[in-house]
């Protein structure tokens, strides 16, 4: 287990937490109230800053309950928070529903999963090795068996 260092920058901030032992995602909480109109998006503050463990990233993902019950999701999903970022963690939520949605203080608005990052060196080549798939993509495997 590694430590995730969190700094509260708002009195209303709640530390990220897993709802159940073994959960991959840490719930992120709103520190503000804001209405997201139907079809629109909004940037919601969490009131926290963090220091990620070395060679990791945080992926911000939607909460399934908000998506199913209210059509609220994370716009750039998954959102990536890089290891070196030290600003406030903010979440871009979008309302895909037909009614306005009110984000309330202390509401669980997203989840965050900490993932290892593989460091790569970009190498330009003239040719790539062949594969069974080749250049097939965008539906090339069909919809049915």
Curated annotation (Swiss-Prot):
It catalyses: dUTP + H2O = dUMP + diphosphate + H(+). The keyword Translocase does not apply. Its cofactor is Mg(2+). It is an enzyme of class 3 (hydrolase). It holds the Pfam family dUTPase. Its EC number is 3.6.1.23. Substrate binds at residues 63-65, 76, 80-82, 90. It comes from the Bacteria. One of its GO terms (molecular function) is magnesium ion binding. Pathway: Pyrimidine metabolism; dUMP biosynthesis; dUMP from dCTP (dUTP route): step 2/2. Keywords: Hydrolase, Magnesium, Metal-binding, Nucleotide metabolism. GO terms for biological process: dUMP biosynthetic process; dUTP catabolic process. Belongs to the dUTPase family. This enzyme is involved in nucleotide metabolism: it produces dUMP, the immediate precursor of thymidine nucleotides and it decreases the intracellular concentration of dUTP so that uracil cannot be incorporated into DNA. This is Deoxyuridine 5'-triphosphate nucleotidohydrolase. The lineage of its organism: Bacteria, Bacillati, Bacillota, Clostridia, Eubacteriales.
């Amino acid at each position: 287990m590694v430590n995730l260092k969190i700094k509260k920058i708002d009195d209303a901030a709640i530390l990220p937490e897993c709802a159940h032992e073994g959960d991959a995602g840490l719930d992120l909480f709103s520190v503000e109230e804001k209405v997201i109109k139907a079809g629109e998006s909004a940037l919601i503050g969490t009131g926290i800053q963090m220091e990620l463990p070395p060679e990791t990233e945080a992926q911000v993902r939607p909460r399934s309950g908000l998506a199913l019950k209210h059509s609220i999701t994370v716009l750039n999903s998954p959102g990536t928070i890089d290891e070196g970022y030290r600003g406030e963690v903010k979440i871009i939520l979008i309302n895909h529903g037909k009614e306005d949605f009110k984000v309330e203080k202390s509401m669980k608005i997203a989840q965050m999963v900490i993932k290892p990052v593989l460091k790569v060196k970009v190498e330009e080549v003239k040719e790539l090795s062949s594969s069974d798939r080749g250049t097939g993509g965008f539906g090339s495997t069909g919809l049915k068996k």
